[in-house]
């Protein structure tokens, strides 16, 4: 499944040690 910005940002905010998408 695809990750949208809305999906990714809360994940990054919850755990900044994990890279969801690399930017």
UniProtKB/Swiss-Prot annotation:
UniProt superkingdom: Eukaryota
Function: Stimulates synthesis of ecdysteroid in the testes of larvae and pupae.
Name of this chain's protein: Testis ecdysiotropin peptide B
Organism from which the protein derives: Lymantria dispar (Gypsy moth)
Organism placement in taxonomy: Eukaryota, Metazoa, Ecdysozoa, Arthropoda, Hexapoda
